From Swiss-Prot:
It comes from Rhizobium meliloti (strain 1021). It is found in: Cytoplasm. The gene is rsmA. This is Ribosomal RNA small subunit methyltransferase A. Belongs to the class I-like SAM-binding methyltransferase superfamily. rRNA adenine N(6)-methyltransferase family. RsmA subfamily. Signal peptide: none annotated.
Length: 274
């Protein structure tokens, strides 16, 4: 890709700007430019699309997204050391890269939307799950984004796509299964990063379901939190604080079942009975 976009190799960029990855920021820089292109392509067509990227670091994925024709990239980076490297990319693609120095957990993402939006990110490990939940829980649906193509630790990716009776099924699987169609795209080995993480990563692609089962996000969160907080117990016990057997009877669910056996539809039924 260095030849494709005319920019220097990422290793040179990192060395020139002194960008050692900070563990406190959950940073692992992805240096394999073939992989950054693969992530960007997984998102689908990027022409006429604004892409929001969180944690671009030295900009390997940013470069891939711009090279594949995104109308604009809005990159949110809290590490000020990375800003000069990103500014060089912005100079190479005039008017197509907006850089915001901020904590992604504090950003109003919907306000950044300018026409169709795709979120593409190698998310910092320490905030990735919380950001995903934030993007899934707005009151209005469909959301401001057309799709999300995100990298997580593989264990988190498995939780995102898990369904009932899967060992990885939990609150995240219910939430993602309720409002999105989610799939695992491909794995990324530790050696693709600097420094190499101790675990394999995976890219997950999510698209919003146009008309999910009507249900209050806050109440669904409350039900899944109670049910999976004691996942090995029968529902009559784990849901006791929310009404226990009376709630389950109202929803038509056997009180002897356990949380991991319930479908997304059944969790929504419980939430709607509260």
């Amino acid at each position: 890709m260095a030849a494709l976009d005319g920019l220097p190799p990422l290793r040179d960029v990192i060395q020139r700007h002194g960008l050692d990855a900070k563990k406190a920021l959950g940073q692992n820089f992805l240096l394999d430019l073939n992989l950054t292109q693969k992530i960007a392509r997984t998102a689908g067509p990027l022409e006429d699309v604004t892409v929001i990227e969180v944690g671009p670091g030295p900009g390997g994925l940013t470069r891939a997204i711009l090279a594949l024709g995104a109308k604009k990239v809005v990159a949110i980076e809290r590490d000020s050391r990375c800003l000069p490297a990103l500014a060089e990319i912005g100079a190479h693609y005039p008017g197509r890269l907006d850089i915001i120095e901020d904590d992604a957990l504090k950003v109003d993402f919907e306000a950044l939307a300018d026409g169709p939006v795709r979120i593409i990110a190698n998310l910092p490990y320490n905030v990735g799950t919380q950001l995903l939940v934030n993007w899934l829980l707005p009151g209005l649906w469909p959301p401001f984004w057309q799709s999300m193509t995100l990298m997580f630790q593989r264990e988190v990716g498995l939780r995102i796509v898990a369904g009932a009776d899967d060992d990885h099924y939990g609150r995240l699987g219910v939430l993602c299964g309720w409002r999105t169609k989610a799939r695992l795209a491909f794995d990324v080995p530790p050696q693709a990063f600097t420094p190499p993480p101790k675990v394999t990563s995976t890219v997950v692609h999510l698209e919003p379901v146009e008309a999910p089962i009507p249900c209050s996000p806050a109440v669904l969160e409350k039900v899944t939190q109670a049910a999976f907080g004691q996942r090995r117990k029968m529902l009559r016990q784990s849901l006791k604080p929310l009404g226990g057997e009376a709630l389950l009877a109202k929803a038509g669910i056997d009180p002897q079942r356990r949380a991991e056996t319930l479908t997304v539809e059944e969790f929504c039924r419980l939430a709607n009975c509260l």
